[in-house]
């Protein structure tokens, strides 16, 4: 591994540790030329399917974009960052399990809606209203009625 400080190509690994989830290795290294230390991370490279948008264009899957859209729906809601990350990981596992090279954005949207429904009902409704492009209040009301009839009432 090349030293980021002096560019020398010979470094020594001082310590290696596997992350808690088991998908990352953290290595502490020392440059044999300048004696400076640095950390590297080794991760499994996963190949997610390309996302086919409604207009037919294709974009690479981006975890950050998915996270941003979920955060927007969950804004000011009592859901932890950890819970959001876990939901995104479940979505990614489903995307990888499909084994497809391409997947329509609508399918990703449905996966997001399922996860949001489990996390927070208000966030689910927020996301669904934008995702399904409601044209008027009646469409919104239909979704709320569908949502209410499938959710048992407390009390």
Swiss-Prot record:
Organism domain of life: Bacteria
Keywords carried by this UniProt record: ATP-binding, DNA-binding, Metal-binding, Nucleotide-binding, Repressor, Transcription, Transcription regulation, Zinc, Zinc-finger
Record domain ATP-cone: where: 49-139
Positions the record marks as coiled coil are none
**Cofactor comment in the record?**
Binds 1 zinc ion.
A GO MF label = zinc ion binding
User: Pfam families under this entry?
Assistant: ATP-cone, Zn_ribbon_NrdR
Names of required cofactors:
Zn(2+)
Bilayer-crossing regions? none
- InterPro entries reported for this sequence: ATP-cone_dom, NrdR-like_N, RNR_NrdR-like
**Could you tell me the Gene Ontology terms of the biological process aspect for this record?**
negative regulation of DNA-templated transcription
Q: Where are the zinc fingers (unnamed)?
A: 3-34
NCBIfam families of this UniProt entry? transcriptional regulator NrdR
Q: What does this protein do?
A: Negatively regulates transcription of bacterial ribonucleotide reductase nrd genes and operons by binding to NrdR-boxes.
Q: Which family does it belong to?
A: Belongs to the NrdR family.
Its name, as the record gives it, is Transcriptional repressor NrdR
Q: Origin organism of this chain?
A: Cupriavidus metallidurans (strain ATCC 43123 / DSM 2839 / NBRC 102507 / CH34) (Ralstonia metallidurans)
Query: What is this protein's gene name?
Result: nrdR
